[in-house]
UniProtKB/Swiss-Prot annotation:
Its EC number is 5.2.1.8. Belongs to the PTPA-type PPIase family. This is Serine/threonine-protein phosphatase 2A activator 1. PPIases accelerate the folding of proteins. It catalyzes the cis-trans isomerization of proline imidic peptide bonds in oligopeptides. Acts as a regulatory subunit for PP2A-like phosphatases modulating their activity or substrate specificity, probably by inducing a conformational change in the catalytic subunit, a direct target of the PPIase. Can reactivate inactive phosphatase PP2A-phosphatase methylesterase complexes (PP2Ai) in presence of ATP and Mg(2+) by dissociating the inactive form from the complex. Residues 362-424 are annotated as: Disordered. GO terms for biological process: autophagy; DNA repair; G1/S transition of mitotic cell cycle; mitotic spindle organization; regulation of transcription by RNA polymerase II. Keywords: Cytoplasm, Isomerase, Nucleus, Rotamase. SUPFAM superfamilies: PTPA-like. One of its GO terms (molecular function) is peptidyl-prolyl cis-trans isomerase activity. It is found in: Cytoplasm; Nucleus. It comes from Candida albicans (strain SC5314 / ATCC MYA-2876). Pfam families: PTPA.
């Protein structure tokens, strides 16, 4: 396999047509569909999500290290949380514990920080994820009997996959976080699923919905901690006319959790304090709303009108999910400000069409400003440099919520063309 460090392929909105033709896009859609179907009618197990992250500061003293799976946790307790022991899932949990510990060791700088705290850059500089990822039990496809070939494939996999993981924590340069970073984590999980790294080692069964929820719960608690501790800006937010300042996928996962759940709350009542308090630690949709209530005050219909609109016009969680996926296809998969930061490698997310031909790259002049993080595998450190594409963007309106056309289906719908302005 010809592994390669991911590189920039999308330089302006015209490149989105080529992205739609790419194997990379097909793989991302496949991962999205696989994940949202796997979490149907599953709850996040108790003790995984951190209640303090979705609780107003007046009720707590600080933002402590999330209680995920402690090092002293017994095997029995672990199996109660994630089912039969899956060593590679536990390694991911260890990774998030390590990243949370780095936050504890990197307090925010004192003084006013309107546009993000510079200590977040120190946090990014400290990250060294490769030693933890190398603990994975790799499948036969990567760890062949040929030692040199095995090392080459494992290093190659880590080279490409770690790029997406490192890019999922927000921008070190801009000090922001948004749906593009959330997409990078989806891509990272997709790479683990594709090479069966998350399969159960003893039974070879595929990862189940509960384990997917646990992994994403660890991720969302980490990045929301980064947002809170370092005051990260929303990346490319529409303000009140966007679904959420930072997230989108989390709502799709949460809506999917409620599908086929006979005890799921009624959609129209899901903004009530009773539902939020009872479901915020077991369901991503409600958990995300609880996080909004932590960040914002005032009438909900004024600061979050799109979500408010959902709960006045939609009557089933299947239709909620359908509408959210349609919005995702347009607002994430078809927006240049988001996808310009999604880079393509050679194996995991290649910039090739379905016949294996390289797609054209309309390269533009770059300046050293905003290049996503890169990982060096021949050392135990990660190196970060920066570049940014200078391109003009047009003023194109935000996509309206598609609640009026919500035919029930499990398939990921095809998108229509639309773009939005990047954050200034």
């Amino acid at each position: 396999m010809n592994w390669k460090t991911p590189s920039k392929k999308i330089y302006d909105s015209a490149d989105l047509k080529n992205f739609e033709k790419s194997i990379a896009f097909e793989k991302l859609q496949k991962t999205l569909q696989q994940i949202i179907l796997s979490v149907e009618n599953h709850k996040i197990p108790p003790g995984i999500l951190n209640v303090d992250i979705v609780t107003r500061p007046g009720r707590i003293g600080s933002i402590p290290l999330p209680s995920l799976i402690e090092p002293t946790t017994t095997t029995t307790t672990r199996e109660n949380k994630i089912g039969p022991s899956n060593g590679n899932v536990e390694i991911l949990i260890e990774l998030f514990q390590y990243l949370n510990k780095l936050i504890d060791e990197t307090p925010p700088l004192k003084g006013p920080t309107r546009f993000g705290n510079f200590a977040c850059r120190d946090w990014h500089d400290k990250i060294d994820i490769i030693p933890i990822l190398k603990k994975f039990k790799f499948p036969q496809e990567l760890s062949s009997s040929n030692n040199s070939s095995s090392k080459s494939n494992i290093d190659g996999f880590l080279l490409e996959s770690s790029y997406y993981l490192l890019n999922s924590f927000g921008s070190k340069i801009r000090l922001d976080y948004g749906t593009g970073h959330e997409l990078s984590f989806l891509a990272f999980i997709g790479s683990l699923i594709e090479f069966k790294i998350l399969n159960h080692p003893t039974t070879t069964e595929e990862i189940n919905g509960k384990e997917i929820l646990i992994i994403f719960a660890n991720y969302y608690d980490l990045v929301r901690r980064l947002i809170l501790v370092y005051n990260l800006e929303p990346a490319g937010s529409h303000g009140v006319w966007g679904l959420d300042d930072h997230f989108h996928l989390i709502y799709i996962l949460g809506a999917s959790q409620f599908i086929n759940d006979k005890l799921a709350p009624i959609v129209q009542r899901s903004l009530s304090s009773q539902v939020i308090n009872s479901c915020k630690l077991t369901n991503f949709y409600i958990n995300a709303i609880a996080f909004i209530f932590r960040l914002k005050t005032g009438p909900f219909n004024e600061h979050s009108p799109i979500i408010f609109d959902i709960h006045n016009k939609v009557f089933s969680w299947t239709k909620v999910r359908q509408g959210l996926i349609k919005m995702y296809m347009v607002e994430v998969f078809n927006k240049f400000p988001v996808l310009q930061h999604f880079w393509c490698g050679e194996v995991l997310y290649p910039w090739k069409d379905h016949q294996g031909n390289d797609l054209p790259v309309n390269e533009k002049e770059e300046t050293e400003l905003d290049k996503p993080p890169e990982t060096t595998l021949n050392s135990t450190t990660t190196t970060t440099t920066t570049t940014k594409v200078s391109s003009s963007t047009s003023k194109i309106p935000f996509t309206p919520a598609p609640w009026a056309n919500t035919t029930t289906t499990h398939a990921v719908p095809r998108n229509t063309r639309n773009t939005r302005n990047p954050r200034s």
